[in-house]
Amino acid sequence: MNLSKYQNESVIRRLLNESKTIAVYGASNKIWRTSHSISKFLLEVGYEMIPVNPNYDEVLGVKCFPTLSDIETQIDIVDVFRHPSEVITIAEEAVQIGAKAIWFQEGVINEAAAEIASSGGLDVIMDRCILKEYNFHIN
């Protein structure tokens, strides 16, 4: 699989600069989880971070939603921290809610999910860390 079409530097830079609201799918209260530290980082640098995880009522003091469909706010980026085998339904849901982009974190590689999102009009980033990319492009 050629990941380069899902790692376009100008798209990454535009998403990081123009986005305001990021739904973190797989957000966690477990401080050792990457999704926890990145959720915290997103809040600290000024994004509206919306956690998505059916196992929590809140993450980092922010109301947590069981699914993307439960969120009433317009989502700019859906940042995905789930096993690649679980992301097709997340991509479908991201399209259904009208998200602008889906960002599959490092190691989350599923071309079928990326194609679903892309065909649905979303920008797609895959196998890149949003925190590292922010530090590279913005900081």
Go through each PLM region and give its residues.
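Structural/interface elements that position substrates and couple domains in central-metabolism enzymes
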Residues: 1-75, 82, 87-139
